[in-house]
Regions:
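Noncatalytic, beta-rich nucleic-acid-contacting surfaces in large DNA/RNA-processing enzymes
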Residues: 1-312
Length: 312
């Protein structure tokens, strides 16, 4: 329709030539229809009983059973969609662990000390060749600057070292090194942002803010998290009102009713919007940080076994 309005020649052909008219009419009917069916790379649908009791199934690649609905429809129906991704690094860790046990029979990678100073010192010095997520030249430089001292620092580092959040790295490091300079808009914000030195790094922090400050439920806060990460403008306009002023019909008290003034509430919302565009899922980052730390531990204390497993 837009092309017909813009192009006079096309409009004339559409009006005067029967074949052109037919082709354009058919194109309008086809426009927007799914081109083909495909299967999610890692998504697995979980239900209480057999999935075909809830949704129609089809046969996908390699004879796998797939739903005929999209993942958004699946979630709207109340089914659980989980992403299960394979990670070769886990095989490296397993192989290294087997080799270490030849000389330390009771060695268990799941029982290593998560506060080992030697490991953090090695990471902070940038000696991270082979360490999961931390071995690129850019990440090495970041780790030298960050000087991680605990698992929280590694989790934050993995979350921040991505396009977008990287802009907030200087602020994060400044807050870590000079905690007295951090300003919190209210007491509740300090409680939530203290682990990340005043920066909103995780999606879970967005959820905590709307729950603690404005009285959102856990379910409603998750909807806000999704809307912010997907930049749904219309939803955000409505939720700003709910966040600041509350919504009695929907059971949201709002910031003002919780003792936070209008100006401060709006400032917090603006800050959330700014950070939430890039905020990372903490549970994902934490899982990656555990794998990173385990590879770092092996590299630090059992370099021969680790490198042999890595190169095999």
């Amino acid at each position: 329709d837009k092309a017909l309005k813009i192009s006079k020649d096309l409009r004339n052909a559409y009006e005067q030539d029967e074949e052109t008219h037919y082709l354009i009419d058919m194109s309008k009917r086809l426009e927007g229809l799914p081109r083909h069916a495909s299967m999610h790379a890692a998504g697995v649908v979980i239900g209480k009983t057999a999935i075909d009791e809830y949704v129609p199934l089809a046969t996908g690649a390699d004879n796998a059973a797939v739903t005929q609905f999209t993942m958004t429809t699946i979630e709207e129906l109340g089914l659980l969609k989980m992403d299960f991704l394979g990670l070769r690094t886990l095989t490296v860790i397993q192989d290294a662990e087997k080799m270490v046990r030849r000389k330390v029979p009771d060695f268990d990678i799941t029982k290593i000390d998560p506060t080992d100073k030697e490991v953090y010192e090695m990471i902070g010095n940038g000696h991270t060749e082979g360490v999961f997520q931390l071995e690129s030249s850019g990440m090495k430089s970041f780790m030298k600057e960050l000087k991680p001292q605990n698992m929280e620092d590694i989790i934050a580092g993995i979350s921040l070292y991505r396009p977008g959040p990287m802009d907030f790295i200087p602020r994060y490091i400044e807050g870590k090194n000079h905690q007295e300079s951090i300003h919190y808009e209210c007491e509740q914000m300090e409680e939530i942002l203290e682990p990340t030195y005043g920066c909103i790094v995780y999606q879970e922090q967005v959820m905590q803010i709307v729950m603690k400050l404005a009285g959102y439920t856990l379910g409603r806060s998750d909807l806000v998290r999704r809307a912010m990460s997907k930049k749904k403008g219309d939803v955000m306009i409505k939720e700003r009102q709910n966040f600041v002023y509350g919504n009695e019909e929907e059971g949201i008290p709002g910031c003002i009713n919780n003792g936070i003034d209008e100006k401060t509430a709006n400032q917090i919302w603006d800050e959330m919007l700014d950070f939430a565009k890039y905020a990372f899922n903490k549970s994902h980052a934490a899982a990656y940080a555990v794998v990173a730390y385990r590879t770092a531990y092996l590299r630090c204390h059992y370099p021969v076994e680790f490198m042999a497993a890595l190169l095999t």
